[in-house]
UniProtKB/Swiss-Prot annotation:
Active site positions, chain numbering: 50 (nucleophile)
Involved pathway(s): Porphyrin-containing compound metabolism; protoporphyrin-IX biosynthesis; 5-aminolevulinate from L-glutamyl-tRNA(Glu): step 1/2
Annotated positions for site Important for activity: 96
Record organism: Alcanivorax borkumensis (strain ATCC 700651 / DSM 11573 / NCIMB 13689 / SK2)
Pfam families reported for this sequence: GlutR_dimer (PF00745), GlutR_N (PF05201), Shikimate_DH (PF01488)
Function: Catalyzes the NADPH-dependent reduction of glutamyl-tRNA(Glu) to glutamate 1-semialdehyde (GSA).
Chain sites annotated for binding substrate: 49-52, 106, 111-113, 117
Other observations noted: During catalysis, the active site Cys acts as a nucleophile attacking the alpha-carbonyl group of tRNA-bound glutamate with the formation of a thioester intermediate between enzyme and glutamate, and the concomitant release of tRNA(Glu). The thioester intermediate is finally reduced by direct hydride transfer from NADPH, to form the product GSA.
Record-given protein name: Glutamyl-tRNA reductase
Length: 418
């Protein structure tokens, strides 16, 4: 069987294409059911975040056409997808999974959210019955290495994430965040982090809007803000200098008209907006308005780079941990291969011995002389055990394979007793 990692991320595909390839939780469940029926797929998991969509699969020797499957499932042409799709196999696939889980392949180097997202992908696949053996074990290796990266390197010493980058970007736009009012849309982990970072910057006011107002109020209370429902967005928007949105809505929740009306009420005081969501929460046309500065996750790269330098050394240490893990994995796989050979050898020899033993027992039951029966049993068993190795060794000798003969001596003979 073969491990395959295939997908797109923020370095290969722009936000528009990543939107097309994003899977909601419900869509991921449908996709996993489809993968379960795909010929050649033994085990599989699907990871879908703002910045990447990836499949991790254990396949038969012939790798299925995942590009075709992904293109069909998202109504894209294979030609368009093939220009941005990457695929890793074997140890390279495992190393890629470790780099992703450790935050080394993220838009924000070392960001911690990706490990939780990968654990969720693992749990979904397990619940769908698509993790039942080797891939499940490989995921545990990945999680173990990712945990070591978090605890043994300084990659998480300075909190950096897409959420932090969004707030950092706002600091570049506004001279003093203490005089700014912020409106956050959503109530997931990303918005929780944004709220925390804004609170640390002592922003004047934080309002959190969510489909479930109770959840919004709960998050807002932790940072001294207030929670509202999505129905209250138009009014709240009139007060917002900073708007950061990250929901799981399949369609935009804020259009150009809503923002135009808010700007009129604000007497066209500028608004800074960051749309972290994929698919996007804010219609792209909003960015055409003269008093709006709209950014997506793809625009955050410059702000993110400020904190990347401090993590480069930690990233090198993390890469060393991954390389060590791959070496251990390779050694364990080789040991497992040896165990399989020994198991097969033992079963084969056991079958031979049982066959000869049954013959000997039958001879004893028929009144045969015990000593003669045992000697014949010994002679016959040794001959049967040595027949196949003898044929192979003669052929090796005839072919001039001296190294193989030395290896055979090492395997077959105990020199201490020779």
């Amino acid at each position: 069987m073969n491990l395959v990692a295939v997908g797109v991320n923020h370095t290969t595909a722009d936000v528009e294409l990543r939107e097309r390839l994003a899977f909601s939780t419900q869509q991921a469940e449908v996709a996993l059911a489809s993968l379960r029926e795909m010929p050649g797929v033994r085990e599989a998991a699907l990871l879908s975040t703002c910045n990447r969509t990836e499949l991790y699969c254990l396949t038969d020797d012939v790798t299925p056409n995942f590009a075709q499957w992904l293109a069909s499932s998202r109504n894209l042409s294979v030609e368009r997808l093939s220009t941005v799709l990457y695929q890793h196999t074997g140890e390279q696939a495992l190393e890629h999974m470790m780099r992703v889980a450790g935050g080394l392949d993220s838009l924000v180097l070392g960001e911690p959210q990706i490990l939780g997202q990968m654990r969720e992908a693992y749990a979904r696949a397990h619940e769908a019955g698509l993790l039942n053996g080797e891939l499940s074990r490989l995921f545990q290796e990945v999680f173990s290495v990712a945990k070591r990266i978090r605890t043994e390197t300084g990659i998480g010493a300075n909190p950096v994430s897409v959420a932090y980058a969004a707030v950092s970007f706002a600091r570049h736009i506004f001279a003093d965040l203490k005089k700014s009012r912020a409106l956050l849309i959503g109530a997931g982990e990303m918005i929780e982090l944004v709220a925390r970072h804004l609170s640390e910057q002592q922003v004047q006011e934080i309002t959190i809007a969510n489909r479930t107002q109770e959840r919004a109020s709960e998050l807002a209370a932790a940072v001294g803000g207030r929670g509202i429902s999505l129905e209250e967005l138009p009014v709240a928007l009139e007060r917002a200098d900073i708007l950061i949105s990250c929901t799981a809505a399949p369609l935009p929740i804020m259009g150009k008209g809503m923002v135009e009306r808010a700007l009129k009420k604000r007497r066209h005081r500028p608004m800074f907006m960051v749309d972290i969501a994929v698919p996007r929460d804010i219609e792209p046309e909003v960015g055409e308005l003269g008093d709006v500065y709209l950014y997506t996750v793809d625009h955050l790269q410059e702000a993110i780079q400020e904190n990347v330098r401090s993590r480069q050394q930690a990233a090198q240490e993390a890469s060393e941990l991954i390389r060590d893990a791959i070496v251990r994995h390779r050694r364990q796989r080789r040991e497992q291969d040896a165990v399989k050979v020994l198991r097969d050898y033992r079963e084969q020899r056991k079958a031979m011995a049982e066959s000869e033993l049954e013959k000997a027992l039958q001879q004893l039951r028929n009144g045969g002389d015990a000593e003669q029966v045992l000697r014949r049993f010994q002679h016959s068993l040794v001959n049967k055990w040595l027949h196949s190795p003898s044929v192979t060794l003669r052929k090796m000798a005839a072919d001039g394979r001296a190294e193989a003969l030395l290896l055979a001596r090492e395997l077959l003979l105990d020199d201490d007793q020779s």
